[in-house]
Amino acid sequence: MHNESVQDYILFAEMLCNGGVGVNGTRILQRETVDDMRTNRLQGEALEDFAKFGGWSKGGYGYGLGARTLMDREKNNALSENGEFGWDGARGCYVVVDPNVQVALFYAQQEAGSTWWDWHGTVRNMVYASIWADR
């Protein structure tokens, strides 16, 4: 992964965290679009199937407009708050966006065949543990 790609990913996550406004103050997405990303669209069996994806790493999450969204933190042992959203790539990249506490996390990895679902929750919880320890 090139350094520019990492920087772009981080800027994109920060923009989402700021409700669609980039770090330079320019509106890139409407707030409603970001809210749609955080609003679960799955019901019933589709929601149950989504929880099983990635080695059961999506328990407690639903799926909005192109992103997973945390609906029940206790089902995922998450230290983040409900409403946190993001996505993970097939080779292990991981994004967490949480406008409620102003967290934009990007974990970069490109490894075919990795079991990324084994550690994404740990990475997320380590970040949140450090945030909550400072409050």
PLM segments and residue spans:
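Catalytic loop of the DD-peptidase/beta-lactamase superfamily, centered on the K-T-G motif
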Residues: 1-135
